[in-house]
Regions:
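Short strand-turn segments of transmembrane beta-barrel domains in outer membranes
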Residues: 211-219, 227-263, 285, 554, ...
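Membrane-embedded beta-barrel scaffold of Gram-negative outer-membrane proteins
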Residues: 359-361, 369-387, 523, 529-537, ...
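Transmembrane beta-barrel wall of Gram-negative outer-membrane proteins
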Residues: 27, 247-281, 286-325, 348-365, ...
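Gram-negative outer-membrane beta-barrel transporters
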Residues: 415, 580-583, 599-679, 750-754
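C-terminal beta-signal and adjacent terminal beta-strands/loops
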Residues: 622, 674-678, 697-755
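Face-selective signature of the C-terminal outer-membrane beta-barrel domain
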Residues: 304-318, 349-499, 523, 569, ...
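Structural signature of Gram-negative outer-membrane beta-barrels, strongest in the C-terminal barrel
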Residues: 424-429, 433-435, 460-584, 627-630, ...
Length: 755
């Protein structure tokens, strides 16, 4: 046994340290640039048709293909939003051929999407198209670009969105990992709930690229990446300075501006810098003015230190304040006490976040590169709300205050190397990093008014550290077949200083978890890819709870399998589908409004996803996503094993009409079916279908737009929960649906000037 272990260890070391074996074939060293200058274009797909060999450009716009037999080949370069290029390249024995190409922007076309490149590009291309073709004006719109993702807002825009994905009520982020340029959005051990992910500091016009994934299959995604993950990349280059203004019903105003700090004539220099700012205000459609306001700012500087080194620094932040009408019980509306847009008890809140993120990317040689980022965030949050009214305190009411004040810092680093073992191409990625959160005075209190604390339910300092490392190996068994395997290890250190103890002191606990993952990807042809993924993941639990528990219950595992395919039946149609299953060992649900943890036992979710993107004609583009999930608790008897708010059927889609190169309109819909609001399905959260209409007229220097939300003025509930409440003077509590009404008919107009 000892000899076997030694051999396995030696093989492992060999896989990491093996270098490319020399061959007598030729190779291609290429660069792809954006436009006339020498700004690299990342994510362009390279494909040699005759021999079915592919690559994708890195952050330097470079790619390297080796072991190419001698001869002439047709090389195809494509990228969403750019004109596809086809050229003939000659490969000579023992010679590295230099290849440089400049790509120019063009209308978005399905035929630019390739399924011959690496799997990440293929699976993220659908949202890449959507990012180019759909109007995006808020972080809500950005999240809706993820196929199957549903969101709801129940604080007028102030709180993080409630998310639904693959049968998960993700709440504000328990099972979806969000990040921007390598910086996490989710907040661990947050006062309002574990994984709280407020993405409102993102200015939508700054987003250059969106990647996403469903399931716990990515090695570099750790905590919260069980149902899925979303990663945004901001622009390095602002092509045009611009000013944009929007105005609409209910006192809605939005202004955003971006200024390129580098003169356009410096397009061939090695530096880029821009600043962007945004302001939002609305009273919203509720009976009581919501007084929502938010200010965002972003500054980013990028220096191409050399052909092989990129350094980027971004500073961003936002500050927001609001009033809210809160969730209201259906019986109050039915009795005529309030309207659908009324209130029982006023709510209010404020929050801010300021970030610094330093990114470094170095290409070590044609076969390997190193990338890293260091981030620092200052965050605060204060929320007054009342979900149960007079259930617990019939005199003062049940208003609670939640407060969070923290500093978060972290570092991510990875080294990637491409080499060969004999004639077998191999790609290795080794990553490591840490995250540290220091929260001062995390608070949940029963309050009266804005200043009187009646009772503190949770109050203390939190320190949480996450150390991690991962190894990811890809073996290119044939040009069409890739096997990927690896593992990730996460180690958590939880410290809680409970001020409510008679003798306050730090209580600590530690836990670690391995998360192995594997996948097999097969390109059947130029137009079809099949894949199988297996992965383990986890979501950590609140430090205030796990500090007093054994390590077995801190990081419950998630096990998941996906079997899927991506098809292009012909050049204008892109289809993707997947059948999947995900098991959770235990669903710890932190109820931030009550300061308790509700372990709901093991669960299983099974379902399928279907997405379609279709360029029907030059003037008509169709897109649709359909998602089905069956979610059940495994330790409960049939009939009482429903998972509250787990959506069974969701669908999003639309049609875009391009009348000419300047004018376009779009009609969109989103649908979510009825879903259980409690464990025995006796209370139903009603589904809805809502239609939106958009129109846009764009020229080189200016742009006009119109958007109508809820075109048919459908009555729908954006957020809804089965909640036990008691109104003033009610003799007994009542458990029923409490909801936040969805947007009624709403129209807004926009104008932009580019310079």
């Amino acid at each position: 046994m000892k000899k076997l272990s030694t051999r396995i260890f030696c093989l492992f070391v060999f896989l990491l340290l093996s270098f490319e074996t020399f061959s007598h074939n030729g190779s291609i060293k290429g660069f792809v640039y954006n436009g006339e200058g020498r700004k690299p274009l990342e994510g362009a797909s390279i494909y040699l048709k005759e021999i079915k060999v592919s690559a994708v450009t890195d952050g330097f716009g470079s790619f390297f293909l080796k072991e190419i037999k001698e001869g002439k080949f047709k090389i195809v370069i494509s990228h969403v939003g750019f004109e596809t290029i086809e050229e003939v390249i000659k490969i000579e024995d023992g010679v590295t051929t230099d290849f440089v190409v400049h790509m120019f922007p063009a209308p978005v076309k399905i035929n630019e999407v390739t399924i011959n490149a690496k799997k990440e590009l293929t699976l993220g291309s659908v949202s890449g198209i959507d990012l180019k073709s759909r109007p995006v004006n808020s972080s809500q719109d950005l999240l809706r670009l993820v196929p199957g993702m549903f969101i709801s807002q129940h604080q007028g825009g102030g709180k993080a969105e409630q998310m639904f994905l693959r049968g998960f009520d993700v709440d504000h982020g328990t099972d979806v990992s969000l990040s921007v340029d390598g910086m996490p959005v989710n907040m661990v051990s947050h006062a309002h709930g574990q994984g709280y992910a407020d993405a409102h500091f993102i200015i939508s016009e700054s987003v250059d690229k969106l990647d996403y994934g469903k399931g716990p299959y990515m090695m570099d995604k750790g905590n919260f990446a069980t149902a899925g993950w979303v990663e945004y990349k901001t622009k390095n280059v602002l092509e045009n300075s611009f000013v944009k203004a929007e105005a609409g019903m209910f006192g809605y105003v939005r202004t955003v501006a971006g200024v390129n700090l580098m003169d356009k004539t410096v397009g061939k220099s090695n530096q880029e810098a821009y600043v962007m700012g945004e302001y939002n205000y609305t009273n919203s459609y509720f009976d009581a003015p919501q007084n929502f306001n938010r200010f965002n700012v972003l500054g980013k500087y990028t220096n191409y230190l050399s052909e092989n080194k990129i350094l980027s620094l971004s500073l961003s932040g936002f500050s927001s304040g609001w009033d809210a009408s809160g969730q209201i019980p259906q019986r109050a509306v039915d009795a005529g006490l309030i309207s659908r847009f009324g209130k029982i008890d006023d709510e209010t809140g404020k929050t801010s976040r300021y970030n610094a993120n330093l990114q470094y990317y170095q290409k070590l040689n044609t076969h390997s590169y190193f990338k890293s980022n260091f981030y620092l965030s200052k965050y605060d949050f204060e929320l007054f709300s009342n979900f149960t009214f007079y259930l617990e305190d019939t005199v003062n009411g049940d208003q609670i205050k939640q407060k969070d004040d923290r500093i978060t810092t972290g570092y991510n680093a990875s080294y990637t190397s491409n080499y060969s073992i004999g004639n077998l191409p191999v790609k290795s990625e080794l990553g490591t990093g840490f995250r540290y959160d220091d929260t001062k005075g995390s608070e949940l209190s029963h309050t009266k008014g804005m200043k009187t604390v009646l009772d503190r339910l949770a109050y203390g300092d939190i320190r949480e550290t996450n150390l991690f490392a991962y190894l990811n190996q890809s073996f290119f068994l044939t040009p069409q077949l890739v096997f990927n395997a690896g593992t990730r290890y996460d180690y958590f250190i939880h410290n809680y200083h409970n001020f409510l103890d008679a003798d306050p002191q730090f209580v600590a606990n530690k836990a670690g978890r391995f998360s192995p993952k594997a996948g097999l990807y097969y390109n059947y042809s130029d137009h079809a890819r099949f894949y199988v993924n297996y992965g383990m993941g986890f979501h950590s639990n609140d430090t205030r709870i796990v500090a007093f528990q054994n390590s077995n219950s801190i990081l419950p595992a998630a096990n998941s399998v996906d079997v899927g395919a991506v098809f292009k039946p012909y050049s204008k149609l892109l289809l993707s589908s997947a059948v999947w299953m995900l098991d959770l060992k235990q669903e710890f649900v932190y109820v931030g409004d009550a300061a308790v943890v509700e372990p709901s036992g093991r669960s299983r979710r099974m379902g399928f996803d279907i997405s379609a993107r279709y360029d029907v004609f030059k003037w008509l583009y169709l897109d649709a996503d359909f998602n089905y999930t069956d979610a059940r608790a495994r330790d409960e008897a049939a009939g009482g094993n429903f998972i509250p708010l787990a959506a069974k059927i969701t669908s999003i889609g639309g049609a875009t009409f391009k009348f000419n190169k300047y004018f376009s309109t779009g009609l969109r819909f989103r649908h979510i079916g009825d879903r259980p609001a409690n464990e025995d399905n006796t209370v139903i959260a009603k589904g809805y279908t809502v239609y939106d209409l958009v129109a846009n007229y764009s020229r080189k220097s200016y742009e006009f737009g119109m958007q109508i939300q809820n075109l048919t003025n459908t009555q729908w509930n954006e957020a809804q929960f089965d909640t036990e409440t008691r109104l003033r003077n009610e003799p007994a509590p009542v458990s029923e649906i409490c909801f936040t009404p969805g947007t009624p008919f709403f129209i807004k107009f926009a104008a932009a000037y580019k310079f």
